[in-house]
Curated annotation (Swiss-Prot):
Keyword Transcription included in the entry's annotation: yes
Name this polypeptide is given: Fork head protein homolog 1
Role of this protein: Transcription factor that regulates the expression of the CLB2 cluster of genes during the G2/M phase of the mitotic cell cycle. The CLB2 cluster of genes includes mitotic regulators such as CLB1, CLB2, CDC5 and CDC20 as well as SWI5 and ACE2, transcription factors required for the subsequent temporal wave of cell cycle regulated gene expression in the M/G1 phase interval. Involved in HMRa silencing.
Biological process (GO), any one: positive regulation of transcription by RNA polymerase II
Biological source species: Saccharomyces cerevisiae (strain ATCC 204508 / S288c) (Baker's yeast)
Keywords: Cytoplasm, DNA-binding, Nucleus, Transcription, Transcription regulation
Additional remarks: Present with 1720 molecules/cell in log phase SD medium.
């Protein structure tokens, strides 16, 4: 079937979205697919970094998180190549692999583990599994063995062999990723792209409508209710004045979507004492003390009363630059709270979810010369500016329940007289002192955007009896066209 336009029209579940939105979803899903803990050969053989602008004749595409294989024949083998191991001792030997997609050297993958074939009778692509450890398609185990029925592949199917996930894409079909797959991938999608879905309307709507996000928000609300009584000494003590104007006028500080992720389990500290010895010019700040040092090993069974948002804020404020990497946030929490240092639960996941969900935190580029990949985290410019403006105006009242980030900012400001900020921040913290500052701050909030890595653009045309033309451009989009 001939192609009359570069953008094929589809009438499927994503038809109301643009081709760019649909491709953005495929890109996002591909980038969060799992790979083996050890390097696999296909990641180097067909690495995305090796792609150059050129035309490729291909029937379809199979893509992992960091590699792309173009299907150029009617049968593709997947397995573990062993010839290169036997010929390494011969200098100058050119190794011709007998496997198309090499998932070695891990022996969990058989030498010939699977094959993807085009069935001329049915006109469909099928996956046959030979390896004893089997495989999954769309997160469900499929029949294994040479006599077992093959599994028909649709465009958007996610294949998992030996812990290496890959997505199968056809040009003649709309690439549909099943809801079941999206539910499995939702924690990674949310952690990587946030509730905004990397500014992709389709991905954003999928994340917002997910059961996972709804459950996360319900858990946050439940944890907030559990934390209510912890704030009672701070908000209702008769011998402590509320924080605000020295003349007694108070204005409640509003804050967007603060999340208190206090988790179940562990032993709560029994008593908390408040002291008015730390009064400052801007108001009396009660100092909350734990009954003992929670960093000591002996207190490993005592769950800290601080929420994850509070501990993240403490970690950020502990740095002179006001920004910190995710790994250093983990280290700060482990060093200061023995409960998490000895905990077997995946509390790091809760930290990542807080960073993604809480608008008080945002990413910032790492400092020049700072080691490690990824970005740093800081207090958002909007939250910092709102806090400092109200502090300088003397209009901070007693902290409302759930405002964990504000509480930590207030305690830090009372003790040190300033809030650290990274160089890229639009707010200059140097002029902020513990005394009431009459000069108002005028700053604009900088919003950092990150573009997700994208699949390579492929233009597929022609008949199944002949190979099809495919434009390959690094970090471009896939334009679905027609194959029959």
């Amino acid at each position: 079937m001939s192609v009359t336009s570069r953008e094929q029209k589809f009438s499927g579940k994503y038809s109301s979205y643009t081709a760019q939105d649909r491709q953005g979803l495929v890109n996002a899903v591909t980038c969060v697919l799992s790979s083996s803990s050890d390097p696999v050969a296909v990641s180097s053989d067909y690495s995305n970094s090796l792609s150059i602008a050129r035309e490729v004749n291909a029937y379809a595409k199979i893509a992992g998180c960091d590699w792309t294989y173009y299907v150029q024949k009617l049968e593709v083998t997947i397995g573990r190549n062993t010839d290169s191991l036997n010929l390494n001792a011969v200098p100058g030997t050119v190794v011709k692999k007998n496997i198309d997609i090499d998932l070695g050297p891990a022996k969990i993958v058989s030498r010939k583990h699977a094959a993807i074939r085009f069935n001329l009778e049915s006109g469909s692509w099928e996956l046959q599994i030979f390896g004893r450890n089997g495989a999954k398609v769309n997160f469900r185990r499929i029949p294994t063995g040479p006599d077992s029925p093959p599994t028909v592949l649709q465009s958007g199917c996610i294949i998992d062999i030996g812990g290496v996930q890959m997505i199968f894409i056809l040009p003649e079909q709309e690439t549909i990723i099943s809801d079941y797959c999206l539910n499995h991938l939702m924690p990674k999608l949310l952690s990587t792209y946030g509730t905004n879905g990397n500014n992709n309307p389709l991905l954003r709507n999928i994340i917002e409508g997910s059961t996972y996000l709804r459950e996360q928000r319900l858990q946050e609300e439940a944890r907030l209710q559990q934390l209510d009584h912890l704030h009672t000494p701070l908000s209702s003590s008769s011998d402590v004045n509320p924080i605000g104007d020295p003349h007694g006028d108070t204005i409640m500080m509003e804050e967007d979507e603060e999340d208190e992720n206090y988790t179940r389990g562990g032993i709560r500290p029994n008593t908390y004492t408040s002291s008015s010895n730390n009064a400052v010019t801007n108001g009396n700040v009660p100092h909350i003390e734990n009954p003992s040092d929670l960093s000591l090993d002996e207190n490993r069974y005592i769950k800290p009363p601080q929420s994850y948002a509070s501990m993240i804020t403490q970690a950020i404020l502990s740095t002179p630059e006001g920004s910190i990497s995710l790994a250093d946030i983990y280290k700060f929490i482990s060093d200061n709270y023995a409960f998490y240092r000895f905990s077997q639960m995946a509390w790091q996941n809760s930290v990542r979810h807080n960073l993604s969900l809480n608008k008080a935190f945002e990413k910032v580029p790492k400092r020049a010369g700072q080691q490690g990949k990824g970005m740093n985290w800081k207090i958002s410019d909007e939250v910092r500016r709102d806090f400092l403006n109200k502090w300088n105006a003397g209009k901070l009242s007693k902290i409302r329940r759930g405002a964990s980030v504000t509480r930590q900012l207030q305690l830090h400001m009372s003790k040190f007289g300033e809030i650290p900020a990274p160089e890229s921040s639009s707010i200059d913290p140097r002029g902020i002192k513990a005394q009431k500052v009459k000069k108002s701050l005028q700053a604009t909030s900088s919003i950092l955007g990150e573009s997700a890595p994208q699949l390579q653009r492929t233009q597929l045309t022609g008949q199944i009896s002949t190979t099809t033309s495919m434009d390959v451009t690094t970090n471009a989009n896939v334009n679905n066209s027609s194959l029959s």
